[in-house]
């Protein structure tokens, strides 16, 4: 009677996800399903979703780290779209990657043109010192 499931002699392991095997947090299985359903190609290799998932996870971590720094600089504990905007636009590579992306409620970067700034002339500085 070897047909039943018994505890003795069972060598079944708990299944590990492809995300866990790759050491990722983002879901590899979901990315694979989306690649198959998206009609990007007739066939999808087994390594492609793992690679794409790792790239997506890295980009998300990079953006969130910079946005967290921007939130901390503004003395806030919650990341808002403004912090994402500041993080992306102040980073050269992320700005190049997401240059044509509009972030809702992101605002604009603070920038004052040089011609509009008050001029530092020597006469006004000397006159104020004499008084």
UniProtKB/Swiss-Prot annotation:
Residue numbers of Phosphoserine PTMs = 128
UniProt site positions, description: Not ubiquitinated: 119
Cross-link position per record: Glycyl lysine isopeptide (Lys-Gly) (interchain with G-Cter in SUMO): 126
Keywords assigned by UniProt, alphabetized: Acetylation, Chromosome, DNA damage, DNA repair, DNA-binding, Isopeptide bond, Methylation, Nucleosome core, Nucleus, Phosphoprotein, Ubl conjugation
PTM details?
A: Phosphorylated to form H2AS128ph (gamma-H2A) in response to DNA double-strand breaks (DSBs) generated by exogenous genotoxic agents and by stalled replication forks. Phosphorylation is dependent on the DNA damage checkpoint kinases MEC1/ATR and TEL1/ATM, spreads on either side of a detected DSB site and may mark the surrounding chromatin for recruitment of proteins required for DNA damage signaling and repair. Gamma-H2A is removed from the DNA prior to the strand invasion-primer extension step of the repair process and subsequently dephosphorylated. Acetylated by ESA1 to form H2AK4ac and H2AK7ac.
Q: Which GO terms describe its biological process?
A: DNA repair
Where is the major localization of this protein?
Answer: nucleus
User: What family classification does the UniProt entry report for this protein?
Assistant: Belongs to the histone H2A family.
Q: What is this protein called?
A: Histone H2A.1
- Which species is this UniProt entry from? Scheffersomyces stipitis (strain ATCC 58785 / CBS 6054 / NBRC 10063 / NRRL Y-11545) (Yeast)
The gene from which this protein is expressed is HTA2
């Amino acid at each position: 009677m070897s047909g039943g499931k018994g505890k003795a002699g069972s060598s079944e392991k708990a299944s590990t996800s492809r995300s866990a095997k790759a050491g990722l947090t983002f879901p590899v299985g979901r990315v694979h399903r989306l690649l198959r359903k998206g009609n990007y190609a007739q066939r999808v290799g087994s390594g492609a979703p793992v690679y794409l998932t790792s790239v997506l996870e890295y980009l998300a971590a990079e953006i969130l780290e910079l946005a967290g720094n921007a939130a901390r600089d503004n003395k806030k504990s919650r990341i808002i779209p403004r912090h994402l905007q500041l993080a992306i636009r102040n980073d050269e590579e992320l700005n190049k990657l997401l240059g044509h992306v509009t972030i809702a409620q992101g605002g604009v970067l603070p920038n004052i043109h040089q011609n509009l700034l008050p001029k530092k002339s020597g006469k006004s500085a000397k006159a104020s010192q004499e008084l």
